[in-house]
Regions:
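Conserved beta-strand in the GNAT
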Residues: 27-35, 41-43, 48
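Conserved beta-hairpin
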Residues: 17-30
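Conserved acetyl-CoA-binding loop-helix of GNAT-fold acetyltransferases
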Residues: 55-68
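Short beta-strand micro-motifs in enzyme catalytic cores
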Residues: 16-20, 42-45
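Conserved N-terminal entry element of GNAT/NAT acetyltransferase domains
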Residues: 1-11
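Conserved GNAT acetyl-CoA-binding A-motif
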Residues: 70-82
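A short, internal acetyl-CoA/4′-phosphopantetheine-binding micro-motif in the GNAT/acyltransferase core
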Residues: 47-55
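Polar/charged side chains located within well-ordered beta-strands of beta-rich proteins
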Residues: 9, 19, 32, 63-66, ...
Length: 82
């Protein structure tokens, strides 16, 4: 992945939605979401990378960041994609 791309976690204490964005030179070039549900379930939601920044490993970095977050904080929970 390009070293100038930064993955940033946007934390929300009010909602169960977790968001990560990919930034390049201060611009958002991608995002990925997940929803923390009741009964120890996590729903993987939308993921997107701007077409000008595809094929640089950004989607993979977003996906792995989200997955590692789940493994660290929600081990044993059911994770599914929608």
């Amino acid at each position: 992945m390009n070293e100038d791309i930064k993955i940033v976690h946007l934390k929300s204490k009010q909602q169960r939605l977790q968001t990560w964005i990919a930034m390049f030179n201060g611009e958002i070039v991608g995002h990925i979401y997940m929803d923390i549900e009741d009964e120890q379930r996590i729903k993987f939601l939308d993921a997107w990378v701007h077409e000008d920044y595809r094929r640089r490993g950004i989607f993979r970095a977003l996906w792995e960041t989200r997955w590692n977050f789940c493994k660290k904080y929600y081990e044993g929970w059911l994770v599914y994609a929608w």
